[in-house]
């Protein structure tokens, strides 16, 4: 029973790490990366559709993304969705493909993005602490129902805290790595 609580918490921690990775991948660092476009939804025949399902996205050069729509008639919709997004990149449409030239980041933009990275990391740490709280509540409930002893509860709480500390340390590492990537010119 006790191991099941820690196992469940660890699975939720892992989901948080994956979520944070996806979030960080979508924050542009001055280099072209197809995951920048992951959050873009295109209005395609009245249905919001992820861009990566409507087109192939390639990186021909370090700061260029090339979007090749599978259906050429959707090119205007894709262009409209990119313009409406918060990317701050203007698409260049040549009729069959869309080019996105990623501008070099200014020092000010880098610092703003670093703040955003910190904020996202903090939100993820809050999620980790909520997972810890849920695990602790579950352990206390088991102790109250006499499924585990008070000593087992203390040991379990200690293990949960240790796992939480490791998860927060991992998030701190991911955050500082992304900040370093952003602030490197």
Swiss-Prot record:
Organism (species): Streptococcus uberis (strain ATCC BAA-854 / 0140J)
Protein encoded by which gene: frr
An example Gene Ontology biological process: translational termination
PANTHER family reported in the protein's UniProt record: MITOCHONDRIAL RIBOSOME RECYCLING FACTOR PSEUDO 1, RIBOSOME RECYCLING FACTOR
Localization per Swiss-Prot or TrEMBL: Cytoplasm
Domain of life: Bacteria
Family: Belongs to the RRF family.
Known function: Responsible for the release of ribosomes from messenger RNA at the termination of protein biosynthesis. May increase the efficiency of translation by recycling ribosomes from one round of translation to another.
Pfam families referenced in this protein's UniProt entry, alphabetically: RRF
Record's keyword terms, sorted: Cytoplasm, Protein biosynthesis
Matches recorded under InterPro entries: Ribosome_recyc_fac, Ribosome_recyc_fac_dom, RRF_sf
NCBIfam families xrefs: frr (TIGR00496)
Any one cellular-component term (Gene Ontology): cytoplasm
GO molecular function terms attached to this record: ribosomal large subunit binding
Name by which UniProt lists this protein: Ribosome-recycling factor
Keyword rRNA-binding: no
